A protein has these predicted regions:
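Extended, well-ordered protein cores
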Residues: 2-270, 279-502, 507, 511-529, ...
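Short active-site loop/helix that positions an aromatic residue
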Residues: 275-276
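Ligand-binding pocket scaffold of soluble enzyme catalytic domains
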Residues: 674-677
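Membrane-interacting alpha-helical segments
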Residues: 679-682, 706
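Short, charged, amphipathic alpha-helical segments
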Residues: 683-691
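A glycine-biased, small/acidic residue-tolerant capping/turn segment at secondary-structure junctions
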Residues: 701-718
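C-terminal accessory extensions/subdomains outside the catalytic/core fold
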Residues: 720-741
Length: 741
């Protein structure tokens, strides 16, 4: 039952991790109950967030509280102890699908208005837009990020190396970025002296002024910057690179972050779609406009909107799309069997996951023929693209990394209070005319300004001083704790980074850095330095801004461990609480498809095990609950045994899946609790549980595995049926009887 101040909050999210929670949470609650630890839940799923935001449209019994806002407030208190599982960062197609499902279940929700005309439609769109994209993490992340591979996981990877594609020195794979007129080239940055408030305004060529964003506060010593990506240069870049991919006979791919960068990146994606399929848009552009095709939602939107046309006309357009593939370079595929290309849906290929996957697979992606091929990876903006080219160059020269000997690159990331680009959505604008965009303070002084033309993307970012100080402190703390070099990935030739370098140099002397190796290197140089050390089996801490935090905590774990879901991801909240994120991967929709088809869930809950141990440890140190420390230590021991005995889920139906892996964690955890000598009460409590689980192992595993091989009934996709899914995810009555005692 919820209490006024739940001790640990376990989040209900989406897709595979949400299914896993139905099996794992009862085990966690059972094991922690006697230690005076309350494990409560909050629903921050996509469906839950939609329902919470439209109470006025719903019946009383359908309404639920706004858990995300509540957790955002909790994150600013010392009591916060939140275990955060991956959730959907909804693209527009996903948002619409969730709305449609909820409407079918009797929720009287409004449709998502893509082109709102009335005040009411604009308000509805605005409410939905707050739910779309990466709407959860920025609210909860009231601290900086400490992500690393736990020793047990690293040792497991060394003993059980994942496959790494071989690299050839004559690989044609490469990264392509704009030569200029991108965010990197146009960036201007300044540090605020004295608190003020600013507004963003557009000044037209005729001198008329239009307010883009009304006044909002800036704190003393805050770093702000503005930049522009030019539409004309972007379109020329796509034209040139598409032709070059054809000439070099490599796959063409585009790697964006349309989920998090929900204003700018879908627009960039849309330009790529229009340029690649230019013949189709030249011929049918007017019709597409009438049909309401939104190219920013990808080619998939063309396919869904032409569904309403007469068969002959629809087939004519489909044939025209197919004809494009005769003249244009082959596209990298998301699903070659179903003909889903890189350009179908903006959220299908996300740079932080797609680039490491390519780098792990010999620098190749899958082509339309279902085979791997060298690839041109288009990452238009130059801010961070160079790090991926550095990995390609390194692997071409030295070959693939060896997981049995390679070092590790943990990360300390500047993230708190919506730092940098990941907090820029409400300050990003697509301009509809030429002129100047200015950031103007209370006295009317323009702090930053950028010349713009029609279609250009303007962006303003900010990062507050307190998070920067905390970030520098965390970097020194981790360097001291590990004894390995810490490298700030900052480029003195980039405007924003130059401001940050001044601050890093000012705040480092506040800490004892005696005997520590701390460097500041531009991202490409920092990457090369880290790769060389990694090859030699040495560890290097990367200390980065918010975007590189995201990119590197996928890149290095995928190379080191084969996945980013096995990372320990701790956010020491700035007011003393703790946020524990379970891995750095997504919510694995393909895993859900397999459950629906054959009731086998291959989701690996290792991230949840690691986060829970860190959460219990935090609880112990903050409120002095000694039992929590015993639970944490024994859970760590159990996780080590779980890995050593290889009890992670199999991909194949009929074999151990997520549910079976939870049984083994419970068995090893109960055993560790029974054997420990620190707390006699816990040892006495768990000895019979460990004995029962061990004696019934064969029967329980048989019950769990025999439940597979049939369709998994979930009663929904975005809004699961609690009763059905609980039954589905806990099919062993023998196991349940022991756990639920």
């Amino acid at each position: 039952m919820p209490t006024e101040k739940p001790t640990i909050i376990y989040t209900i999210t989406d897709e595979a991790p949400a299914l896993a929670t139905y099996s794992l949470l009862p085990i966690i609650q059972s094991f922690t109950a006697s230690s005076g630890i309350n494990v409560d839940t909050r629903d921050i799923s996509l469906a839950g967030r939609i329902i919470a935001n439209f109470p006025e449209h719903l019946k009383e019994e359908q309404r639920i509280g706004d858990a995300l806002t509540e957790l955002g407030e909790l994150a600013q208190t010392p009591e916060a102890n939140i275990i955060k599982l991956p959730n959907i960062s909804a693209s527009i197609p996903q948002l619409k699908a969730a709305i449609k499902e909820l409407q079918a279940k009797g929720y009287d929700l409004p449709n998502y208005p893509e082109e709102p005309s009335t005040y009411e439609e604009k308000a509805i769109k605005s409410a939905y837009d707050k739910i779309k994209g990466s709407a959860v993490n920025p609210v909860l992340r009231e601290g900086n990020s400490d992500r690393r591979a736990p020793l047990s996981v690293k040792n497991y990877a060394k003993k059980n190396p994942h496959s790494m594609g071989a690299w050839s020195s004559d690989s044609k794979s490469h990264v392509s970025s704009m030569a200029g007129d991108d965010f990197f080239g146009s960036e201007k940055s300044t540090t605020i002296s004295g608190a003020t408030e600013v507004k963003i305004e557009f000044v037209g060529a005729d001198g008329s002024v239009k307010e883009l964003k009304s006044a909002f506060p800036l704190l003393d010593k805050e770093v702000i910057d503005s930049s522009v990506l030019k539409k004309k240069a972007l379109v020329e870049f796509f034209e040139k690179e598409i032709a070059d991919a054809k000439e070099q006979d490599v796959l063409l791919s585009l790697h964006m972050k349309a989920t998090m960068m929900k204003v700018s990146d879908p627009v960039i994606f849309g330009h790529a779609v229009k340029v690649y399929y230019k013949d189709v848009f030249a011929k049918y552009g007017k019709l597409f406009e009438e049909l309401g095709v939104d190219v920013n939602n990808g080619l998939g939107d063309v396919y869904s909107k032409i569904e309403s046309l007469p068969a002959a006309q629809k087939e004519e357009i489909e044939a025209a799309i197919q004809a494009v593939y005769q003249t244009q370079p082959e596209l990298a595929m998301v699903d070659s069997d179903r003909g889903i290309t890189n350009l179908h849906v903006p959220s299908d290929i996300i740079v932080d996951a797609s680039m490491p996957a390519m780098l792990r697979s010999s620098g190749q992606m899958w082509g339309p023929d279902g085979k791997q091929k060298d690839t041109k990876a288009m990452i238009p903006d130059r801010c961070y693209a160079g790090i991926y080219q550095a990995v390609i160059d390194f692997c071409k020269e030295h070959g693939a990394f060896d997981p049995t000997t390679m070092g590790s690159v943990p990360n300390v990331g500047l993230m708190a209070q919506k730092a940098e680009e990941y907090g820029s959505h409400d300050k990003t604008f697509i301009l509809d005319a030429a002129g100047t965009v200015r950031v103007v303070d209370a006295s009317g002084t323009a702090l930053l300004e950028q010349a713009v033309e029609e279609g250009d993307i303007f962006r303003m970012c900010q990062v507050k001083d307190a998070p920067i100080q905390d970030w520098v402190k965390l970097a020194v703390t981790r360097a001291r704790a590990t004894g390995v070099p810490a490298v700030f990935w900052l480029d003195e030739n980039r405007a924003h980074d130059a401001e940050l370098i001044k601050k890093v140099n000012a705040y480092l002397p506040d800490h004892d850095t005696t005997g520590l190796e701390i460097k500041i290197l531009a991202p490409v140089e920092a990457c090369k330095y880290s790769l060389e050390r990694m090859k030699a089996g040495l560890d290097t801490i990367s200390v980065t801004g918010n975007v590189l935090r995201d990119y590197l905590t996928d890149l290095f774990p995928i190379l080191e461990l084969g996945t980013s879901a096995k990372m320990l991801s701790i956010v020491p909240l700035m007011n003393g609480g703790g946020l524990f994120e379970t891995g750095a991967g997504g919510s694995a929709p393909k895993h859900v498809q397999q459950v629906e088809k054959e009731n086998h869930l291959r989701w690996d809950s290792l991230g949840e095990f690691l986060a829970l141990a860190a959460s219990l440890e935090h609880l112990s140190s903050v409120i002095g609950n000694a039992k929590a420390q015993v639970l944490a230590d024994t859970l760590d021991k159990a996780t080590g045994e779980f890995l050593d005995k290889n009890k992670s889920p199999s991909r194949k139906v009929g074999e151990l899946d997520n549910r079976g892996s939870h049984f083994y964690l419970a068995l090893y955890w109960a055993k560790a609790l029974a054997e420990q000598t620190v707390d006699a009460d816990l040892a006495t409590e768990f000895a019979p549980i460990a004995k029962s689980l061990a004696e019934q192992e064969e029967k329980i595993v048989a019950e769990l595995n025999s439940a597979q091989g049939v369709k998994g009934e979930l009663g929904g996709y975005y809004l699961l049926d609690d009763v059905l899914v609980s039954k589905l995810m806990r099919p062993s009555e023998t196991f349940n009887a022991i756990i639920d005692k």
